[in-house]
Amino acid sequence: MKTIIALSYIFCQVLAQNLPGNDNSTATLCLAHHAVPNGTLVKTITNDQIEVTNATELVQSSSTGRICDSPHRILDGKNCTLIDALLGDPHCDGFQNEKWDLFVERSKAFSNCYPYDVPDYASLRSLVASSGTLEFINEGFNWTGVTQNGGSYACKRGPDNSFFSRLNWLYKSESTYPVLNVTMPNNDNFDKLYIWGVHHPSTDKEQTKLYVQASGRVTVSTKRSQQTIIPNVGSRPWVRGLSSRISIYWTIVKPGDILLINSNGNLIAPRGYFKIRTGKSSIMRSDAPIGTCSSECITPNGSIPNDKPFQNVNKITYGACPKYVKQNTLKLATGMRNVPEKQTRGIFGAIAGFIENGWEGMIDGWYGFRHQNSEGTGQAADLKSTQAAIDQINGKLNRVIEKTNEKFHQIEKEFSEVEGRIQDLEKYVEDTKIDLWSYNAELLVALENQHTIDLTDSEMNKLFEKTRRQLRENAEDMGNGCFKIYHKCDNACIGSIRNGTYDHDVYRDEALNNRFQIKGVELKSGYKDWILWISFAISCFLLCVVLLGFIMWACQKGNIRCNICI
């Protein structure tokens, strides 16, 4: 019985040697591109989702959680608002003459001096923030006939009643308050910012007690402007034990101009001026901590890297920042179209080319060759076509960043309640800009992705056509990215095809002869190999069944005896 089974096995092996796929006079050469098991989906102009081997995320969606103190000079407002620091609130004295690129206002900031309001708060805040300094110069104003340096228990500096350090509260001297008429020329070559105010007593009694006159008036003029303020006497909500208020105003005096102050009462006078500088300093409301790190881009959420062209962390930014978009993700293709390799290629592991799928594990190149010949199988990358594709894809990310990064800051915009319609319009414009940029970003990335995929497909086709031109009639295009070579082609021959030194004339006669011989016996169906192997397997199976049947019949008749020993 053992002899019969052994003979059957030998017979099947002999038949297998005569199948066309094992003919040593031919070889198979396939071309394909790199593939990965799990690619990345990107969007192109023609396809919402197409898989590529590699892609780079273009949207920065998270911050560091802290504001970096470099390269920008960050000034932490702590418990002080910028306006309180400007006026000289006692608990903000540490900010005198400070400079910054970005002033960070905290939600915990508070005022701790005489209650005040600023009718044009947003404009003053923006002006001082962009100036980037609280540098203050005292001037010798001549306030004759009045008492200076008024203070209040609502504004303590240590244990003493005090006032804003940059303002001078004037009130009557003995029982008189003369008309004040003071001028101050600007003989320097820069703009000067003067901060002044008007006191609004809570009662008529307080008005006459401080300023004698029942109604005061303050007029501040330059050659270009004039402001006249009449105090509004009356009670207001109590703040820090007071129902009176101070209104803060400001005047810019240009070089060569003159500041003129005229008043018969209620004047909160300036002590000097602030230097106004032009620059790109700014202010931001944020509760993010300030850390020791470096980042060009700052948002209220914290600093973010600017190595991506887009971000959706916050609309408010400072520095060289990615463009704000609504999308959470935009992926830029930096690899080729991905067609994962099929895990099984038939019973005998046939190879296939790029028409069917890519190849995994090709780490030394994007495009390459696989071959099957009398010496076995092998694989090699084509470095020239790989480098051609990489050279064109490299730099895509940098080019997109250059097109989109803002080299300026997007400041916070504030409006008073009376400017509500302007605020609504500004919000509409900002939202429209964001919508437009979000659409443009998606379109830009889709165009770049389309170009990348078309480019990598083109390099694959170029390599295939180059190989076809070398082989000519010595091989047949199998329609799946492979060539059936009709002559014996060892590894040296395969290498010459890869490096472009293959001479088809050397193998022409052998190839033509083999082509005609093989064509005479090959099936024309696309499933010829499958049919041959299935027929072979069925034949072997039937042969074994017949032999086993014969053995069982012989045993039953007593012609063969089987002994089973344990």
From Swiss-Prot:
GO terms for molecular function: host cell surface receptor binding. A lipid is attached at residues 555, 562, 565 (S-palmitoyl cysteine). Residues 1-16 form the signal peptide. Palmitoylated. It is a single-pass type I membrane protein. It is found in: Virion membrane; Host apical cell membrane. Keywords: Clathrin- and caveolin-independent endocytosis of virus by host, Clathrin-mediated endocytosis of virus by host, Disulfide bond, Fusion of virus membrane with host endosomal membrane, Fusion of virus membrane with host membrane, Glycoprotein, Hemagglutinin, Host cell membrane, Host membrane, Host-virus interaction, Lipoprotein, Membrane, Palmitate, Signal, Transmembrane, Transmembrane helix, Viral attachment to host cell, Viral envelope protein, Viral penetration into host cytoplasm, Virion, Virus endocytosis by host, Virus entry into host cell. Gene3D superfamilies: 3.90.20.10, 3.90.209.20. The chain crosses the membrane at residues 531-551. Residues 17-530 are extracellular. The record marks 345-346 as: Cleavage. Disulfide bonds join 30-482, 68-293, 80-92, 113-155, 297-321, 489-493. Pfam families: Hemagglutinin. GO terms for cellular component: host cell plasma membrane; membrane; viral envelope; virion membrane. Its main location: virion. The keyword Kinase does not apply. HAMAP family: INFV_HEMA. Binds to sialic acid-containing receptors on the cell surface, bringing about the attachment of the virus particle to the cell. This attachment induces virion internalization of about two third of the virus particles through clathrin-dependent endocytosis and about one third through a clathrin- and caveolin-independent pathway. Plays a major role in the determination of host range restriction and virulence. Class I viral fusion protein. Binds to sialic acid-containing receptors on the cell surface, bringing about the attachment of the virus particle to the cell. This attachment induces virion internalization either through clathrin-dependent endocytosis or through clathrin- and caveolin-independent pathway. Plays a major role in the determination of host range restriction and virulence. Class I viral fusion protein. Responsible for penetration of the virus into the cell cytoplasm by mediating the fusion of the membrane of the endocytosed virus particle with the endosomal membrane. This is Hemagglutinin. It comes from Influenza A virus (strain A/England/321/1977 H3N2).
